[in-house]
Every structure is written in C-alpha cells, then in structure tokens.
Amino acid sequence: LESSQRGKKGMFLACQYPQEFPGVSVLNFLRQTVEARTSKEISILNLRKQMLAWMDKLDMDSAFADRYLNEGFSGGEKKRNEILQMALLEPDFAVLDETDSGLDIDALQIVATGVNEIMKSRPHLGVLTITHYQRLLDHLKPSHVHILVEGKIIDSGGFELVEKLDTEGYEAWL
C-alpha cells in the first residue's frame, strides 16, 4: 500500500529523520491528514484548538502551528511535532522509529510523556517502538520486547529483556 493509504487505514509512522516540507504549514498539513484519515471536513478553528492543547502538553511554542512542517526545526522539535501528529491523527497502530534519536533528557521525557498520554487515552492503540537505547523504554514500559540481531528476532519476552540487554549487551544472545 502507498503511505497515504496506510495512513487512511490507521497506521502512523514517526521517522528517525522527519522530512521537511517547505511551504506547508504544520496546521495545514494536519488539517489535510486528519481530513484524509477521517473522511470528514474539520473546522480549522477546532483543529487549532486541539493542536494548541497538545502543543502545550509537548512544551511547543504555539508559533509552530504556522511554521512550515519541520523546516528549521531542531531534532527535538521534529520529534515533538511527530507526537503532536500522532495525537491528532488518532491512529490504530503507530511505529516509532528511533523516536529517541538525538533527544536530550528533558525532550525525551516530554516525548515519552506525550506517547504515554496518547496510549492511555487510546487503550487499543498498538505501538511498535524501535530503539537502540533503554531510556525511552524506561518511560514507556512496553508489555512485549523483541530483540533483533541482523534483521531477525532472536528473543521475545517482557521488560526483563530490556534490563538484560542493558546489563549484558547483545553478547548475551550471540
């Protein structure tokens, strides 16, 4: 399926390196994507209101709503913007591809809190988090963990695998 079709079906992808879209404001991007996802027109005023509430939760300046999508955003701003998109699009399944990449400790906490709030409000939301580091997982507390080596799942279990990986490294599985 094309990415737009996957999005309409309820799949969300937060990329490791979010793309910039010069000329497309965050607000207009979200209006178009929310309308495509729901097949309903959305009031720009209502959308802005929802955006501003989430931007406040994600410690984003409200001016970002009118800036071009990811253009000139720092790494942390791009990641927060992706969580904003995830919140407003209300996907059924989300893939967070190295969402913690390049985040300082404060930004990581804000992003993780946002993801947790989305998951709490949408208990049936499936989230696949791809990461190389334990820090994000410490905040998200995944129910299932899969260890991949060379593209293959070599072990599956609960959060205890995260702790084992952190203390023993991949050597425990090689």
Show the residue positions of the predicted features.
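ABC ATPase NBD coupling module
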Residues: L1-F12, L165
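Q-loop/switch helix immediately C-terminal to the Walker
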Residues: K9, L13-Y17, G23-T38, Q50
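Short coil-to-helix "N-cap" segments within the ABC nucleotide-binding domain's helical subdomain
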Residues: R37-D56
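Walker B catalytic motif
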Residues: V95-T99, D106
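Helical segment within the ABC ATPase nucleotide-binding domain
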Residues: L108-P123
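Conserved H-loop
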Residues: R122-H132
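Conserved beta-strand-loop-alpha-helix hinge in the C-terminal portion
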Residues: H144, L148, K152-L174
